[in-house]
Regions:
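C-terminal lobe and adjacent flexible extensions of AdoMet/dcAdoMet transferase-like proteins
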Residues: 201-210
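Short catalytic micro-motifs in class I SAM-dependent methyltransferases
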Residues: 112-115
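Conserved alpha-helix/loop element of class I SAM-dependent methyltransferases that forms part
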Residues: 28-46, 57
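A short glycine-rich, Lys/Arg-flanked "PGG" loop and its adjoining helix->strand segment in the class I
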Residues: 123-135
Length: 210
């Protein structure tokens, strides 16, 4: 059953959803999938919060161990994820994630979602994530960072223009994720570079210092 939040937006991914995964694989192969799954381990018994997970196909291989919540603002993507992850123990939610008291998670996955948001939206989301994370919980970030060569800069420019046109993305550039996270007292615990560092997979936790 899908759970609806009170704050919904027009589904900007309705045109992309049917072929989004195939398009991603055509352009990047399995590199983006690997960035989302390279830190996924010992999931059994953990409660996971997935925000902006798309069609969920990249998580299918370990869906039997997934328990928690799956949030999407695209109804078409969420419907596909519910089918692709029908073997999981996730509940599926349509709308913008908002923390609920005493509903906390071991892990929060932010995979290729922050690059679609304005800085102030990222900051607001991270506040909600902070409320929803257990004291020793981790945030798993995977996203595009600074392009490492001319070809990557060209490809990124094409991608940004494409998603601004087709999916109404707001940004004309990439956020400085690390600056925003550090400003909110998050610590980077681990990092893996993909595509020479254009894509990074990172693990973050809350600093215990003030």
């Amino acid at each position: 059953e899908l759970v609806h939040s009170f704050k919904l937006v027009k589904d900007q991914y309705s045109l992309l959803a049917p072929f989004y995964n195939r398009l991603t694989k055509l352009v990047f192969g399995d590199q983006l999938k690997w960035s989302k799954t390279c830190f996924a381990e010992n999931l059994s018994g953990k409660k996971v919060l997935i925000i902006g997970g798309g069609d969920g196909l990249d998580y299918q291989i370990f869906q039997d161990d997934l328990e928690g919540e799956y949030w999407e603002i695209s109804r078409s993507m969420l419907l596909k994820s519910k089918i692709n992850l029908e073997g999981s123990d996730l509940s599926f939610h349509l709308g913008f994630f908002q923390a609920e008291k005493e509903n906390v998670f071991d892990e929060v996955w932010l995979h290729f979602v922050l690059d679609t948001m304005r800085d102030e939206e990222i900051e607001s989301l991270l506040i909600e994530v902070r409320k929803s994370l257990k004291p020793k919980g981790k945030v798993y970030l995977a996203d595009f960072f600074v392009p490492q060569n001319l070809y990557q800069r060209f490809k990124q420019s094409i991608m940004i223009h494409f998603f601004r046109m087709v999916a109404n993305h707001k940004r004309k550039n990439l956020p400085d994720y690390e600056e925003i996270l550090k400003r909110q007292n998050w610590l980077k615990n681990a990092e893996r570079d993909i595509l020479k560092g254009w894509v990074k997979a990172q693990v973050w936790s809350l600093s215990t210092s003030i």
